[in-house]
Curated annotation (Swiss-Prot):
One of the GO biological process terms: protein refolding
Record keyword Nucleotide-binding present: yes
CDD domains, sorted: GroEL (cd03344)
Name of the featured protein: Chaperonin GroEL
Lineage of the species this protein comes from: Bacteria, Bacillati, Bacillota, Bacilli, Lactobacillales
Gene: groEL
Record's keyword annotation contains S-adenosyl-L-methionine: no
Gene3D superfamilies listed in its UniProt record: GroEL (3.50.7.10), GroEL-like equatorial domain (1.10.560.10), TCP-1-like chaperonin intermediate domain (3.30.260.10)
EC numbers on record: 5.6.1.7
Length: 542
C-alpha cells in the first residue's frame, strides 16, 4: 500500500485539527454542569455518556493525519484511565492546551526540543507540588465526597463509601446490572467461590435450597474422591466430634458420592461436597488460600500427603459455611492472622509485577476474599440507555475512590492545578526551556476555564479571581460560589490529578517534536457497475 507523507508545520497542523475535534467533543462533559455525548453503537441503543475515555475511543476521523492526532489524545485518556481510573477529560483538556500553545511557538521559530524539556520540567515540578498538597483519606465521609464528585450523585457516593467500609480498601467491589429499577448494594463477607453442592440431597434448608453448616471441619484436596474407603478413616474421626464436614475436592463421584448422600439422608452425619474452584495453577493457588484462611492443609501428592492418612489436624475450620447450587461461602475461617497477612502480602507483590489485566483482576479477587469480602453494586435503571450510563458513572466513581485512598485528595474543580502554578515560579530557565515552562503554566488554568465555561461563566474572569484567592479556595461551578474546596467536599484524588498532567505532558512533548507524519494513502474507490439500459430486453422472458 502506498503512503502519504507530510512534513514540518503541515504535519503538526493536520494532527492539531484531529486533536481539536476530539478534545472539543470530550471537554463539553467536564465539571458539575458538563453535558452528555451520544454515541452511536453498531448494535443496540445509542450510549449516552459523559465519560471522557469512552467518548475518545469511539472517535474515528476520515482524514488519516487528523485521525492520528485524535488517536494520540485518545491514548492519553486511556493511559490516565488505566493508571488512575478517572481524570480522562482533564487529561484531554491539558493535552490540547499544551499542544496548541506549543505549536504557536514552534511555528514562530522556537526549538521544539527545548520546549519539550521545559514542558517535562514544569510537569515534574507541578506533580511534586500536587503530591505535597495531598491529604490522606481514611474516613467514610471523605470517601463518599470523592465518589459523589466523580459521579455527580450523592446516592452513588453513599453506595461506594458503604461498600469500601464493609470490605476494606483491598476488598473487591464489582458492578453488575440489576434485574429491577433500584440500585442496591450486596456484600458477601468471608470467602466465596462459584461452586455449589454436588447433590441437592445435601441441602439442609429446603425452603431456600441451601446447605448450612455450623462450625464445620473443611477437607481441602486437589484429588478426585471416587472410593469412600479413601476418606473412611477421616469420616470416623469426624463422626466422634459430632461436627459437620465440608469437602472441597477436584471431584466426588463413583460410589463415594451416593454413600455420602445416603449417610446425610439417614442423619449419620452432616456432609456437603463441592468441586474445587478455578482451573490448573489458579485452582492450586485458590485451594492454598482456602487452607490458610481456615487453618487447614491442602491434601495433595505434591506435599506427600494421602487422604487415607489425613487427620483432624489437617482439616480447616470455620464458624459457618453456606452452600447453594452455584456458590460456597465460608465465614470466619480459623486461620491465623499472621499466616493470612503473609499470604495477602505475597498476592500484593504478585499484583505489582503482573502485566495481564485478566490475571491482575483474578489476583485482586483472591486478595479481597482473604482480606475482607466482596461487595456487589447492582445498578438499576428504567431503560437500557440509562443503565449503561449509570454503570460508567459508578465505575469512574469507584476508580476515583480507590485512587483517593491510595494517594490522598486535593482541592477539586481544577483548583489544585492552578495552585500548583506557584511551584513553577521557582523555576528559572532560559530560552525555549522557559517557553515550555510558561506553556504548562498557561495549560494548568485550562480545566478551570473549561469547567466555568460549561457552567455558563467566563473562564478568564474566574481564573483572574482564583489567582488572588488563598490556596484551597476555589469556584464551585454548581452553585456559582467561592468556597474552601476541601471543606465543601469538592475534592479530586491526587493520583487522578497528577496522572492527567503527567500523561498530557508526555504525549504533548512527543507531538511537538514530530517532524514527519506517514499515513496510508486512501485506496481509489472501485468503479461502479454501469446502469442497465431499460431498452434491452430480459432474454427468455415474456
Amino acid at each position: 500500500m502506498s503512503k502519504e507523507i507530510k512534513f514540518s508545520s503541515d504535519a503538526r497542523t493536520a494532527m492539531m485539527r484531529g486533536i481539536d475535534i476530539l478534545a472539543d467533543t470530550v471537554k463539553t462533559t467536564l465539571g458539575p454542569k458538563g453535558r452528555n455525548v451520544v454515541l452511536e453503537k453498531s448494535y443496540g441503543s445509542p450510549l449516552i455518556t459523559n465519560d471522557g475515555v469512552t467518548i475518545a475511543k469511539e472517535i474515528e476521523l476520515e482524514d488519516h493525519f487528523e485521525n492520528m492526532g485524535a488517536k494520540l489524545v485518545s491514548e492519553v485518556a486511556s493511559k490516565t484511565n488505566d493508571i488512575a481510573g478517572d481524570g480522562t477529560t482533564t487529561a484531554t483538556v491539558l493535552t490540547q492546551a499544551i499542544v496548541r500553545e506549543g505549536l504557536k511557538n514552534v511555528t514562530a521559530g522556537a526549538n521544539p526540543v527545548g520546549i519539550r524539556r521545559g514542558i517535562e520540567l514544569a510537569a515534574e515540578t507541578a506533580v511534586a507540588s500536587i503530591k505535597e498538597m495531598a491529604i490522606p483519606v481514611h474516613d467514610k465521609s471523605a470517601i463518599a465526597q470523592v465518589a459523589t464528585v466523580s459521579s455527580r450523585s450523592e446516592k452513588v457516593g453513599e453506595y461506594i463509601s458503604d461498600a469500601m467500609e464493609r470490605v476494606g480498601s483491598d476488598g473487591v467491589i464489582t458492578i453488575e446490572e440489576s434485574k429491577g429499577m433500584q440500585t442496591e448494594l450486596d456484600v458477601v463477607e468471608g470467602m466465596q467461590f462459584d461452586r455449589g453442592y454436588l447433590s441437592q440431597y445435601m441441602v439442609s434448608n429446603t425452603e431456600k435450597m441451601v446447605a448450612e453448616l455450623d462450625n464445620p471441619y473443611i477437607l481441602i484436596t486437589d484429588k478426585k474422591i471416587s472410593n469412600i474407603q479413601e476418606i473412611l478413616p477421616l469420616l470416623e474421626q469426624i463422626l466422634k466430634t459430632n461436627r459437620p464436614l465440608l469437602i472441597v475436592a477436584d471431584d466426588v463421584d463413583g460410589e463415594a458420592l451416593p454413600t455420602l448422600v445416603l449417610n446425610k439422608i439417614k442423619g449419620v452425619f452432616n456432609v456437603v461436597a463441592v468441586k474445587a474452584p478455578g482451573f490448573g495453577d489458579r485452582r492450586k493457588a485458590q485451594l492454598e488460600d482456602l487452607a490458610i484462611l481456615t487453618g487447614g492443609t491442602v491434601i495433595t501428592e505434591e506435599l506427600g500427603l494421602d487422604l487415607k492418612d489425613a487427620t483432624l489436624e489437617a482439616l480447616g475450620q470455620a464458624a459457618k459455611a453456606t452452600v447453594d447450587k452455584d456458590h460456597t461461602t465460608i465465614v470466619e475461617g480459623a486461620g491465623s492472622v499472621g499466616a493470612i497477612s503473609d499470604r495477602v502480602a505475597i498476592i500484593k507483590a504478585q499484583i505489582e509485577k503482573i502485566t495481564s489485566d485478566f490475571d491482575r483482576e483474578k489476583l485482586q479477587e483472591r486478595l479481597a476474599k482473604l482480606a475482607g469480602g466482596v461487595a456487589v453494586v447492582k445498578v438499576g435503571a428504567a431503560t437500557e440507555t440509562e443503565l449503561k450510563a449509570m454503570k460508567l458513572l459508578i465505575e469512574d466513581a469507584l476508580n476515583a475512590t480507590r485512587a483517593a485512598v491510595e494517594e490522598g485528595i486535593v482541592s477539586g474543580g481544577g483548583t489544585a492545578l492552578v495552585n500548583a502554578i506557584a511551584a513553577l515560579d521557582k523555576l528559572s530557565e532560559e530560552g525555549d526551556i522557559q517557553t515550555g515552562i510558561n506553556i504548562v503554566r498557561r495549560a494548568l488554568e485550562e480545566p478551570v476555564r473549561q469547567i466555568a465555561a460549561n457552567a455558563g461563566y467566563e473562564g478568564s474572569v474566574i481564573i483572574d479571581k482564583l489567582r488572588s484567592e488563598k490556596v484551597g479556595t476555589g469556584f464551585n461551578a454548581a452553585t456559582g460560589q467561592w468556597v474552601n474546596m476541601i471543606e465543601e467536599g469538592i475534592v479530586d484524588p491526587a493520583k487522578v490529578t497528577r496522572s492527567a498532567l503527567q500523561n498530557a505532558a508526555s504525549v504533548a512533548g512527543l507531538i511537538l517534536t514530530t517532524e514527519a507524519v506517514v499515513a496510508n494513502k486512501p485506496e481509489p474507490a472501485a468503479p461502479a457497475m454501469p446502469p442497465m439500459d431499460p431498452s434491452m430486453g430480459m432474454g427468455g422472458m415474456m
